[in-house]
Design a protein with these regions (language model features):
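N-terminal ligand-binding/catalytic initiation module
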Residues: 13-153
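Short, Lys/Arg-enriched N-terminal segments with co-localized hydrophobic residues
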Residues: 1-13
């Protein structure tokens, strides 16, 4: 394995920084997701530096963007007869080694950035198991705590 000179190392580090800068411009305000991507890029940079073929196939860019995102409304009727509408999401990140797998989160703080962060990390968690599963995550800003069975159903 050949060692890289300082200029080559700087250029490659700049490449991951360019990927992150482009991602930040595209996904402004998604702080949880961008922080997760930043941490992963920092940790994989030494391996990325040793394998120029990863850049050729744009491996990092393919990993950091979800395959698809579904956004939908969740209308429901509370015990008082009032109609409420929450937002639901399903982020499907990567199915390169198998079908998307990831849980569901229900909490008022749920937003797209949080689910992208969780789906991104789920991809790596699943890859570390011996089961062929990709990564995804779903959820809604619906708060089930304190709701009746009828409201949750």
């Amino acid at each position: 394995m050949a060692f890289l000179n300082t200029n080559q190392k700087h250029n490659i580090c700049m490449k991951t920084e360019q990927i992150l800068t482009a991602l930040e411009a595209k996904h402004q305000g998604e702080k949880e997701y961008l922080q997760a991507v930043r941490e992963v890029l920092q940790s994989i940079e030494p391996v990325y530096n040793e394998h120029p073929e990863f850049e050729r196939v744009r491996l990092v860019e393919r990993l950091v963007e979800p395959d698809r995102i579904l956004t939908f409304r969740v209308p429901w009727v509370d015990d008082h007869g009032d109609v409420n509408i929450n937002i639901g999401y399903r982020v499907q990140f990567n199915n390169a080694i198998g079908p998307y797998k990831g849980g569901i989160r229900f909490h008022p703080s749920v937003n797209l950035s949080i689910l992208k962060f969780l789906g991104f990390e789920q991809t790596f968690k699943n890859a570390l198991t011996t089961l062929p599963m990709g990564g995804g995550k779903g959820g809604s800003d619906f708060a089930p705590r304190g709701r009746s069975e009828a409201e949750i159903m």
